[in-house]
Amino acid sequence: MTDLHPVRRALLSVSDKTGLIELGKSLAERGVELLSTGGTAKALRDAGLTVKDVSEVTGFPEMMDGRVKTLHPMVHGGLLALRDNDAHVAAMTDHGIGEIDLLVVNLYPFEAALKRGAAYDEMIENIDIGGPAMIRAAAKNHAFVNVVVDVEDYGVLLEELDQNDGQTSFAFRQWLAQNAYARTAAYDAAVSNWMAGAIGLDAPRRRAFAGQIAQTLRYGENPHQDAAFYTDGTERVGVATAEQLQGKELSYNNINDTDAAFELVSEFAPEDGPAVAIIKHANPCGVARGATLLEAYNKAFDCDRTSAFGGIVALNMPLDAETAEAITQIFTEVVIAPGASDEAKAIFAAKKNLRLLITEGLPNPQDAGLTTRQVSGGMLVQDKDVGHRAMDDLKVVTEKAPTEEQMADLLFAWKVAKHVKSNAIVYVKDGQTVGVGAGQMSRVDSATIAGVKAQRMADAMELPESLAKGSAVASDAFFPFADGLMEAASNGATCVIQPGGSMRDDEVIKAANDAGLAMVFTGMRHFRH
């Protein structure tokens, strides 16, 4: 095998015709013979290029509505033959098989059909057979054959040919082959996952995942870790599909925290009023509603002014000038919002390092999906936590029932607690978190920390008593003992929302009654690890 190998004959068969004519002309100008199929051949001919149909090469017409056209030894022999193997060369000569040095294929648009919700039969017809077979054949024989599966690589291919006098290097072909195998793997993953859903398999025997590189990151969570950001093709509204209007390149931690912030704030529908979430290390340090976006931001900021420094701000409404001005008064890493006014953009423009992401919408917090986590030797896969509770879903278990105002705060706290690392305790008062206890091994400790935060908030605002007084409390899981509940009561809480389900529920309910608390059960847990 030699390092450099010439490109004299190319087979082009593409669904996406972007850049096809330019590529065909460039190859023809370099003396490359063009083979093609169906609509690709027609497009090239219409552009005035000389093209040989694959059916002329195989001696068989395209048949079965195009299902069979390239699955033939005259094609696969030309892709798979080892040019330095005498037996292979002899077989090619005996059977009149010509070498194919370049394969350009992009596959039937299965993923596009999936996104638009095509019917079952249409999905089946969008499963490419000949394309992946040729891609895998060409990639296997990358010692001699180039395989291009992405439009953005057309220019790279031409540059390689020009740099090597019409030849390509082994390293280049190897790079193309890796990308080709990744493409067919992603394609098959999309097909298998669609089919699992179509037939209702919650836990298929094999599960495939695929991603498309979006960004090579400077480093991971820490500087000694390499990292990259991949999109999964679902196009859920959020950080992966947002447009970055300004600011430094997003880091690994920026992306992780921004996703957490936007998913949280999306729990609050715009029609219910402005809402703002401020996130640090994937935990909320402040979440609030307000009559205006500015009021919501100020209330969220007041929750924990210290932790908000260097945080992520997520809005459920387009950013306006007044809120933009307030945000710029403190160092903020990222702001993510459905939109931004021209005035707000102008204010942010003076802060060159501040990253502004625009999503053009909010995700539906109840949209189904999967979450994954690597463990040693395997992967955990589960349904996304899209559990939702409304007022009618709650069960009052104490002698005292929450008032209408308390119920509103309880539901607010419950939405926030869903996005706090367990064990999670959240104190809320008047549509504003006043204390968040996150990630503690003991639920009592989380309640204590949330109480400390509420007192610090009061001190910072020069208020005479802790903001936990009169607050609503949410716990992401049941209270196994009454101690966590009593800690919240000692801090001044007046009502509680929790899943219930402890073997000591009766003991906890009695403690709530003795303390004069109103308490409701949701029947749903929101662990987050």
From Swiss-Prot:
Domain MGS-like: from-to ranges: 2-149
**Pfam families documented for this protein:** AICARFT_IMPCHas, MGS
Give the matching SUPFAM superfamilies.
Cytidine deaminase-like (SSF53927), Methylglyoxal synthase-like (SSF52335)
Record pathway: Purine metabolism; IMP biosynthesis via de novo pathway; 5-formamido-1-(5-phospho-D-ribosyl)imidazole-4-carboxamide from 5-amino-1-(5-phospho-D-ribosyl)imidazole-4-carboxamide (10-formyl THF route): step 1/1; Purine metabolism; IMP biosynthesis via de novo pathway; IMP from 5-formamido-1-(5-phospho-D-ribosyl)imidazole-4-carboxamide: step 1/1
Q: Which UniProt keywords apply?
A: Hydrolase, Multifunctional enzyme, Purine biosynthesis, Transferase
Q: Which domain of life is it from?
A: Bacteria
InterPro entries for this protein = AICAR_Tfase_dup_dom_sf (IPR024051), Cytidine_deaminase-like (IPR016193), MGS-like_dom (IPR011607), MGS-like_dom_sf (IPR036914), PurH-like (IPR002695)
Q: What is this protein called?
A: Bifunctional purine biosynthesis protein PurH
Q: Which NCBIfam families match?
A: PRK00881.1 (NF002049), purH (TIGR00355)
Q: What is its EC number?
A: 2.1.2.3, 3.5.4.10
- From the UniProt record, report the name of the gene that encodes this protein: purH
- Per the entry's comment, what about the domains? The IMP cyclohydrolase activity resides in the N-terminal region.
